[in-house]
């Protein structure tokens, strides 16, 4: 039985016209595949609104969070009024929306009266996954209205995780058992499940979230669990790009990447792909396609084993924020590394990844990558918190904190074509480089520069992609 898992991101389900396009895609692919599984994100912008509402609840601002919930209700009800739904489906959806939002108001009320930080983190996860639940119910209703047997399923019953709220780690084996029990029987009956991305639950049933972009990870776990032949990630761009088009206007679509290249691309800042998405499917050799929901005829980008080394060139270049710490002394870096990790976790619920550490007899340097999943304010908040903590720990010596950019060239040819490294360094001549690192996968080569040199470094390396010879 040919099985396809399709994930629709927030930009793919953000408007009525986008949902009609999703319906068209599903109806078309239903004719080509024996079994379909859909994974959906919240409507575009909804998760950010829910995070804002939770913050207001923590501050006791009842009027503020109630206003946001009212706006969410208005938006979702307006959408289902515009969709081609019968009265029965529309009425049931309205009841579902109200029930979910009333439950969320109860969570916010509990946050207002709690000073327990751990409990607040648990409640945050319980509340911000509501957007996915709303979207899943709307899409399932739209499919049923068009004679597709469909049901919305919450992944709190499927994806089993640890209790790292905000960036939970799935237990793949336990999740696959849940998928076999709850999803496979539906597929055998010809039902199309519409499954919430981003969310999971601990073994005790406490809701968790998988970090920003976590719906990709949901799709890969489901793909492995149902034995999918392919996974398609639908978004609002034509595929993975050679660079972020917001930073490099000559960026173009990458037709094909290996698993290793795509994983490095995600790790070093590509926002289209979750950093942990590929791990559950590599051993299964399931190919992934990234496609534009508004231009479904375009081929998109393919991720699969082996990338065609005959190209022997750089595939992409990325930029991601980091924090660099320097000191005019030598000594153990373990204490300062632990302090950075603790500070980042306190501010973002993400752990620090030490990118580069180096020492001479008189100088120490440490560069820490701030993952995109930590959110847009992570770099600023971490910088300020680190400066404060370091000023209180003079015994460890005087450390200076700077915001930096980590510019990374991606290619699986670095291991057998070392001249690529020379080409990158030659392209960056006259730019001050703070540090260098080649990834253990041999698919990445990174340079650390002060943030105001990031754009220039990106453009220079991207020229090597456009003109490889």
Model segments located where?
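A conserved regulatory-domain signal marking ACT and ACT-like small-molecule sensing domains
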Residues: 299-469
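Positions that flank functional sites
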Residues: 158-159, 238-240, 296, 362, ...
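Short phosphate-binding/catalytic loops that engage adenosine nucleotides
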Residues: 34, 148, 286, 352, ...
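Acidic/polar loop patches that form or flank catalytic/metal-binding clefts of enzymes
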Residues: 274, 285-292
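Nucleotide/pyrophosphate-binding catalytic subdomain
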Residues: 1-273, 278, 448-450, 469
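Short hydrophobic alpha-helical runs that function as membrane-insertion/retention elements
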Residues: 230-234, 288-290, 355
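Acidic carboxylate-rich catalytic motifs and surrounding loops in phosphoryl-/glycosyl-chemistry enzymes
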Residues: 156, 291-294
């Amino acid at each position: 039985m040919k099985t396809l898992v399709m994930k629709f991101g927030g930009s793919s389900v953000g408007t009525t016209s986008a949902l009609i396009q999703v319906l068209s895609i599903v109806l078309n692919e239903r004719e080509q595949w024996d079994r379909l599984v859909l994974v959906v994100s919240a409507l575009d912008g909804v998760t950010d609104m829910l995070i804002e509402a939770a913050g207001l609840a923590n501050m006791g601002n009842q009027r503020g969070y109630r206003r946001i919930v009212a706006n969410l209700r208005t938006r979702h009800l307006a959408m289902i009024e515009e969709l081609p739904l019968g009265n029965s489906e529309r009425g049931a959806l309205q009841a579902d929306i109200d029930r979910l939002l009333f439950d969320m108001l109860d969570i916010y009320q509990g946050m207002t009266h709690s000073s327990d930080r751990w409990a607040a983190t648990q409640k945050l996860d319980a509340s911000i996954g509501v957007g996915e639940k709303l979207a899943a119910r709307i899409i399932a209703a739209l499919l049923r209205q068009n004679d597709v047997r469909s049901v919305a399923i919450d992944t709190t019953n499927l994806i089993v995780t640890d209790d790292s709220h905000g960036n939970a780690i799935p237990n793949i084996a336990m999740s696959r058992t849940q998928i076999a029990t709850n999803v496979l029987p539906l597929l055998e009956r010809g039902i199309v499940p519409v499954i919430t991305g981003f969310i999971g639950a601990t073994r005790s049933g406490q809701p968790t979230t998988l970090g920003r972009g976590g719906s990709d990870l949901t799709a890969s776990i489901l793909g492995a669990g149902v034995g999918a032949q392919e996974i398609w990630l639908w978004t609002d761009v034509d595929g993975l790009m050679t660079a972020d088009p917001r930073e490099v206007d000559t960026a173009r679509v990458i037709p094909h990447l290996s698993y290793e290249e795509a994983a490095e691309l995600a790790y070093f800042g590509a926002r289209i792909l979750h950093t942990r998405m590929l791990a559950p499917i590599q051993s299964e050799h399931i190919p992934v396609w990234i496609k534009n929901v508004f231009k479904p005829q375009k081929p998109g980008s393919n991720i699969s084993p082996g990338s065609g080394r005959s190209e022997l060139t750089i595939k992409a270049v990325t930029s991601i924020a980091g924090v660099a710490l320097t000191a005019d002394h030598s000594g153990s870096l373990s204490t300062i590394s632990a302090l950075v990790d603790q500070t980042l976790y306190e501010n973002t619920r993400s752990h620090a990844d030490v990118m580069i550490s180096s020492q001479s007899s008189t100088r120490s340097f440490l560069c820490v990558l701030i993952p995109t999943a930590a959110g847009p304010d992570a770099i600023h908040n971490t910088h300020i918190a680190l400066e404060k903590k370091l000023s209180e720990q003079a015994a460890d010596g005087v450390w200076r904190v700077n915001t930096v950019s980590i510019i990374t060239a991606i290619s699986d040819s670095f291991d057998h074509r070392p001249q690529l490294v020379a080409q990158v360094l030659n392209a960056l001549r006259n730019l001050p480089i703070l540090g260098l690192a080649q990834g253990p996968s041999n698919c990445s080569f990174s340079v650390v520069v002060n943030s105001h040199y990031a754009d220039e470094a990106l453009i220079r390396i991207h020229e090597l992609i456009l003109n490889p010879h």
